[in-house]
């Protein structure tokens, strides 16, 4: 292609999961894209747990795939174990989770980026974003990003910039008394950019995360541990894949004990978190083992999962034993666990805190409100998790591409936005920019009020055609979706026209109350297994199980789904009422000082967003609504 450094449309800063999806999206939409990262060989690393997916997280991975992203395909290519979580519960909270070969995963990410047209990789550290409307003191008031500056002094121009710095922006690693400016153990932090952003007027904070030690498989006795049952059939994340044929690796369940806890209690004073050296807030739902022991003193044990890091490595990941205690204490602590009495640690557990950009300074398109053309995604926005990062990354990449294109064509910029009823990604971004964060944000099904519509099996139905319309998704994906929808209609027709017979009832006693009813009507009975109905008809049994289950769920929960649709229609009216970008809230008499301050800080885009803000009363919403209607 041969375009020079001055020719880029989009620059992505950082090569983690957010950066990879952002760069791929922008490049695939035809924009000349540069991904700058400190170490090209570290692109796409699974820095912590060797797994992808989980409750609500698996939904996000499938949404990324439906949008034309790659995380689902990477996961399929590296899968070594598959489990559908919450199978005994309702379909709204079921989600796929896989163990991944972490080294193969990173190779796939790097190779895909290298092979993508319109995309270049460059190894350097970005220390500043050059903006218009910058004062002599470096402050920016509603300027526009048009270049980045690197540590080696290169100035590279761009029409849009996406920041995906992960834990590296001003990162510091802690292990007992050891402390170093690193974003990941052994990898130096990115200095300069955080200070540059503060100078421009951005409000920054610090958050913390951590990771457990890794041990050698040959040094532990897995035979005394409980093998974790996995699903017999590996199912793909990507809608482009039909089946997965890969080697399987086992995970194991273990527990801490009173000896473990006593050792930890005796060494609380050596933890940098308890001594006050780490002041940043950590992830509530993934606490360190010392935090668990301190908060739950009556617990006699805490569950651990022993997980393989890949097929071509002997390293095991001890899920549940995150720590920042000194290495000598980690050695002793791990050896109190059954089967690990002679464990050899290859990499110690550690904590890392890092700089974040408070996300209320972003619009719903993940563009900063202070600097147009500057987007951010992933842990810099206060989230935790590979999946949350990837979900933000693809949206930031799409919108950076659309913004860059608009500056070339001089046409109006129309951002790509996912609403709360369209995707978990939409829920997450709305939460971040509307409510902000005071701790690392993790996605849960409970955060989504329309989760019956946001099931993992419907991600393609919700998002694929939207992605195709903006030039990101392939036509083959749309054709696959259309085939699936035709199949669903065929299944529905068969369920509506076939009835439960006496023969069926004699074979299955639970069908007796439903003799003469259609299969569809029978499915509304929650005690009737979906698979039972499929087995009653040879034609139905030949259809893909996942597609049949999707139809069955929609029939069984149609009244709940209809109620959600009504609620969505009501909310849409509020979302349709826009608030001008520089609206003067001081003009509204009757608005409390607290509410006015919050509104001026967040600068919501719509009345619907105002209603979801923290500390905003219904009366405030009505006052604002009345003023806008004048």
Curated annotation (Swiss-Prot):
NAD(+) binds at residues 282-296. Gene3D superfamilies: FAD/NAD(P)-binding domain, GidA associated domain, C-terminal subdomain. Homodimer. Heterotetramer of two MnmE and two MnmG subunits. It comes from the Bacteria. It comes from Treponema pallidum (strain Nichols). Pfam families: GIDA, GIDA_C_1st, SAM_GIDA_C. GO terms for cellular component: cytosol. SUPFAM superfamilies: FAD/NAD(P)-binding domain (SSF51905). FAD binds at residues 14-19. Keywords: Cytoplasm, FAD, Flavoprotein, NAD, tRNA processing. GO terms for molecular function: flavin adenine dinucleotide binding. NAD-binding protein involved in the addition of a carboxymethylaminomethyl (cmnm) group at the wobble position (U34) of certain tRNAs, forming tRNA-cmnm(5)s(2)U34. It is found in: Cytoplasm. GO terms for biological process: tRNA methylation; tRNA wobble uridine modification. This is tRNA uridine 5-carboxymethylaminomethyl modification enzyme MnmG. The gene is mnmG. Belongs to the MnmG family. Its cofactor is FAD.
């Amino acid at each position: 292609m041969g375009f020079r450094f001055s020719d880029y449309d989009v620059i992505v800063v950082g090569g983690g999961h957010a950066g990879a999806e952002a760069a791929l999206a922008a490049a695939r939409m035809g924009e000349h894209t540069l991904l700058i990262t400190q170490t090209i060989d570290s692109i796409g690393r699974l820095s912590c747990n060797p797994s992808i997916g989980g409750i609500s997280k698996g939904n996000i991975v499938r949404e990324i795939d439906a949008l034309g992203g790659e995380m689902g395909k990477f996961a399929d290519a590296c899968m070594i174990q598959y489990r559908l979580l919450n199978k005994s519960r309702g379909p709204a909270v079921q989600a796929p989770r896989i163990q991944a070969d972490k080294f193969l995963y990173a190779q796939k990410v790097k190779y895909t980026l290298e092979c993508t047209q319109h995309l270049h990789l460059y190894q350097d550290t970005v220390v500043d974003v050059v903006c218009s409307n910058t004062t002599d003191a470096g402050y920016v008031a509603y300027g526009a990003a048009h270049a980045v500056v690197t540590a080696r002094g290169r100035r590279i121009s761009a029409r849009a910039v996406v920041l995906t710095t992960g834990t590296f922006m001003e990162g510091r690693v802690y292990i007992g008394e050891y402390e170093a400016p690193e974003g990941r153990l052994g990898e130096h932090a990115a200095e300069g950019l955080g200070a540059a952003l503060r100078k421009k007027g951005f409000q920054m904070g610090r958050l913390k995360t951590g990771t457990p030690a890794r041990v050698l498989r040959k040094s532990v006795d897995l035979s005394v541990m409980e093998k974790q049952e996995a699903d017999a059939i590996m199912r793909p994340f990507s809608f482009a894949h039909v089946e997965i044929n890969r080697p399987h690796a086992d995970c194991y369940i273990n527990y801490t004990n009173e000896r473990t806890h006593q050792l930890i209690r005796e060494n609380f004073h050596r933890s940098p978190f308890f001594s006050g050296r780490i002041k940043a807030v950590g992830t509530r739902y993934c606490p360190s083992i010392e935090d668990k022991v301190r908060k739950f003193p009556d617990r006699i044990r805490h569950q651990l999962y022993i997980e393989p890091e890949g097929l071509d490595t002997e390293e095991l990941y001890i899920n549940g034993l995150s720590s920042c205690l000194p290495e000598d204490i980690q050695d002793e602590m791990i050896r109190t666990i059954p089967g690990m009495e002679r464990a050899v640690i290859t990499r110690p557990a550690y904590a890392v805190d890092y700089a974040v950009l408070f996300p209320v300074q972003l619009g719903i398109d993940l563009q900063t409100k202070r600097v147009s053309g500057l987007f951010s995604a992933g842990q810099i926005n206060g989230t935790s998790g590979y999946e949350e990062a990837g979900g933000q990354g693809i949206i930031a990449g799409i919108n950076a591409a659309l913004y860059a294109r608009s500056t070339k064509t001089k046409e109006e910029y129309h951002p790509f936005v996912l609403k709360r009823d369209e995707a978990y990604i939409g829920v997450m971004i709305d939460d971040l920019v509307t409510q902000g964060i005071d701790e690392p944000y993790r996605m849960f099904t409970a955060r989504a009020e329309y989760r019956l519509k946001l099931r993992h099996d419907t991600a393609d139905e919700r998002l694929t055609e939207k992605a195709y319309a903006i030039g990101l998704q392939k036509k083959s994906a749309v054709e696959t979706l259309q085939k699936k929808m035709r199949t669903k209609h065929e299944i529905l027709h068969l369920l509506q026209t076939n009835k439960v017979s006496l023969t069926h009832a004699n074979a299955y006693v639970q069908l007796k109350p439903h003799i003469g009813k259609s299969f569809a009507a029978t499915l509304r009975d929650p005690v009737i297994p979906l698979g039972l109905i499929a087995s009653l008809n040879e034609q139905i049994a030949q259809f893909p199980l996942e597609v049949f289950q999707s139809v069955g769920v929609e029939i069984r929960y149609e009244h709940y789904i209809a109620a959600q649709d009504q609620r969505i229609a009501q909310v849409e009216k509020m979302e349709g009422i826009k608030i001008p970008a520089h609206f003067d809230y001081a003009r509204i008499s009757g608005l409390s000082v607290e509410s006015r301050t919050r509104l001026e800080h967040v600068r919501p885009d719509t009345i619907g967003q105002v209603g979801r803000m923290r500390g905003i009363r219904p009366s405030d919403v009505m006052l604002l609504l009345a003023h806008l209607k004048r």
